[in-house]
Amino acid sequence: MAPTFITLWIGNNDVLGYATSGGTSPAAPTSVGQFQQLYGGIVQGLQQYIAVSGAKVAVANIPSVTAIPFFTTVGSQIAAGLPWAQLPLGFVYQKAGESGIGSGSASQSNMASGQILVTLRGSSYASLIGQPTGKFYKDNKFPALPAGIDTTKPFGVHPQNPFPNAFVLDADEIATAQNTVASYNAHIASLANANGYALVDINTAFNTYRQNDLDGTIVNGITFKTTYVSGGLFSLDGVHPTSQAHGIIANEFIKAINAKFGAKIQPIDVSAIPGSLYFQGKVSYKNGYPIIPKEVLDNVLF
């Protein structure tokens, strides 16, 4: 092949694995230094090819974890559904590094505002909050309960039976993910500017959709939100874009390419792409929470 135009969108999984595991992944986000080295190597290869081909390049940056429904769905439902006046400690969870007694405690406003995020994997357990249960430990085949855990205590509202760390991004973990994304994106922007590439700002685009969730954002007559399934932007795993959202992303590329290189590529009519409303009726709910079988999200990074 001898391409005359190259697009590059890479780096999402360097932070997503850490975030989707609730910060418990054995691999922390790819360090900024290593990311810079790896991304720089890709750009070096591109520059070598550009030198002999004259090809043009567009690169895209990385969206925030706080803009996708894998992280924003369950916490807001917990905020709306718990009898907060009856919970002196609020929502009790394990902070980063904890596997036994949980020292984290969140109020209704903490949950509603996204200061604490509960992953979509935690949805099936959210319906059990307040019950004396050890379902999490049974489902995950713990040989014995961690020290300090007492499953006769009400789940998710007592320090001795806290909501598991694997399903929660606490304030420190959110900061780690956000700071990592910001550093990655700064490096991507720097290399794009230095080498004359078009920069596609997917981060700002997704954040804008998230900020407009109350009324939604209208594209080609269709209203889009970042809400799980019904919003039309994200697929059933809460991470990957729908077909129509890929059209929206393509238009972001087109906009950046036209602006940078003076091209006249016409935008895609997103309404001509089949939507995903069919799937809205295919998600089961319990007490308002989507029930997601564990194995469904095992390969969320692919």
Please provide the spans of the model-predicted regions.
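Conserved SGNH/GDSL esterase-like catalytic core that processes O-acyl groups on lipids
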Residues: 1-44, 64-66, 71, 270-300
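Mobile gating loops/cap/lid regions near enzyme active sites that modulate substrate access
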Residues: 72-179, 186-239
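Structural recognition of the beta-strand scaffold that forms the well-ordered cores
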Residues: 4-9, 16-17, 56-61, 198-201, ...
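A structural motif corresponding to the C-terminal end of an alpha-helix
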Residues: 41-59, 180-200
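Histidine-centered active-site loop/cap adjacent to the catalytic His
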Residues: 224-275
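Mature extracellular "passenger" or substrate-interacting domains of secreted, surface-exposed proteins
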Residues: 1, 5-9, 17, 31-41, ...
